[in-house]
């Protein structure tokens, strides 16, 4: 059975799936540098957990929220996959008291969005700016009638303006559209899916099944592994999480089939195996993941954030926020953050005030939405 983006399981099914889960950690040493990582067999009532210090709801009644990016004033832009709207959620200043619900407004509609299946308005990214200034543009990844593409949108601090395509022709399908984008200084990383055609992930002439690295005009970025190519890494099935650690290393989460989901450390020009291999392999020419979740019912990792030496992975089918300790290029044993609820989780991001923001994804057609879903949560985690 193919795992696309996360079929929904009821509470009983989730407990059975987790009870049977085998969580495989790929790495040589533990964070302490003494014990070798080994497989973990978590029981449904005994999986390791991390406690919350605080959880607040900062926004409600969002429709299939997908992308999340922060502006310099601490407010957040949120893309809604199925409506094409970009919403703005007020933030909080450093040192100000945490608020629960904050003001949410609509700043515009991204033109050309054709929502359907896993496609629609997906990732959103904000470039860095000097302190005290607003960005003049933002970036968005969307599915159109013909393709997936990335656009640059003028931004005046209040609303969306002119829209300019910078990368077009990314193959689209009902499933496996990728969609996460990430700004690093003057470079934009773009995660694409294989569009349901696995062999495209190994095709260097196709933009599908890749992580791309481009400048703000969509041209191949200086220093790319292949001159004149936008491709940074290849061999991906469906990457939907991208994050940089404190040393500037790029990490990614990737959906597998029913076999294994992955947390990967991305290195320029590396091949991550799909569809030749999935999960860990001894085959030459492919780079192994740092962590795998197997079976995929325990994860379906969509969002990724890195904060204070740990990766946080938002999972759809697993309905869990996973915390994975990082030390350099090594990844430790994942633990589930005790959120006190079970919801499909789409996106997690580190906020400027040191909190984590986390979006639920119960209105995406595969969940059981409540009357005020979807929500944006603000978390402080006991690490």
Name each region found by the language model.
Residues 344-347:
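Repeated scaffold domains used in trafficking and secretory/extracellular systems
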Residues 145, 256-261, 265-272:
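Short edge-strand/loop segments of extracellular domains
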Residues 205-215, 222-247:
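Loop-centered beta-sheet repeat module
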Residues 102-116, 163-177, 216-233, 271-296, ...:
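Surface-exposed loop and turn segments in beta-propeller and other repeat-based domains
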Residues 33-53, 95-98, 209, 219-225, ...:
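Blade/loop signatures of beta-propeller domains
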Residues 24-29, 35:
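Hydrophobic core
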Residues 3-25:
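N-terminal export and membrane-targeting signals
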Residues 33-197, 249-256, 298-328, 333-338, ...:
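Acidic, Gly/Ser/Thr-rich repeat motifs that build Ca2+-stabilized beta-propeller blades
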């Amino acid at each position: 059975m193919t795992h696309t983006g996360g079929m929904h399981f009821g509470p009983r099914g989730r407990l059975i799936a987790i009870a049977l889960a085998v969580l495989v950690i790929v790495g040589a040493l533990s964070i302490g540098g003494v014990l070798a990582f080994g497989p973990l067999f978590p029981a449904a009532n005994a999986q390791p957990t991390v406690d919350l210090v605080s959880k607040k709801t900062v926004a409600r009644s969002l429709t299939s929220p997908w992308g999340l990016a922060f502006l310099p004033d601490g407010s957040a832009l949120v893309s809604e996959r199925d409506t094409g709207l970009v919403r703005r959620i007020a933030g909080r200043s450093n040192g100000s008291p945490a608020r629960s619900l904050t003001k949410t407004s609509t700043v515009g509609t991204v033109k050309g969005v054709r929502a359907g299946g896993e496609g629609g308005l997906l990732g959103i990214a904000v470039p860095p700016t000097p302190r005290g200034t607003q960005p003049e543009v933002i970036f968005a990844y969307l599915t159109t009638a013909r393709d997936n593409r990335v656009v640059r949108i003028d931004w005046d601090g209040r609303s969306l303006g002119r829209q300019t395509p910078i990368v077009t022709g990314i193959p689209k399908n009902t499933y496996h559209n990728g969609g996460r984008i990430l700004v690093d200084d003057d470079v934009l990383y773009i995660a694409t899916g294989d569009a349901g055609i696995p062999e495209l992930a190994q095709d260097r002439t196709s933009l599908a099944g890749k992580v791309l690295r481009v400048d703000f005009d969509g041209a191949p970025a200086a220093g790319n592994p292949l001159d004149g190519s936008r491709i940074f890494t290849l061999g991906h099935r469906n990457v939907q999480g991208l994050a940089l650690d404190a040393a500037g290393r790029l990490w990614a989460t990737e959906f597998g089939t029913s076999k294994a989901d992955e947390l990967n450390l991305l290195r320029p020009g590396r091949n991550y195996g799909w569809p030749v291999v999935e999960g860990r392999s001894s085959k030459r020419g492919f780079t192994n993941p740092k962590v795998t979740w197997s079976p995929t019912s325990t994860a379906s990792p969509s969002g990724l954030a890195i904060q204070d030496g740990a990766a946080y992975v938002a999972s759809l089918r697993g309905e869990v926020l996973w915390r994975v300790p990082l030390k350099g290029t090594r990844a430790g044993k994942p633990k589930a953050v005790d959120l006190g609820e079970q919801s499909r989780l789409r996106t997690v991001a580190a906020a400027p005030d040191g909190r984590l923001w986390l979006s639920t994804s119960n209105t995406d057609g595969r969940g059981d939405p409540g009357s005020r879903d979807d929500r944006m949560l603000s978390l402080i985690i006991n690490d």
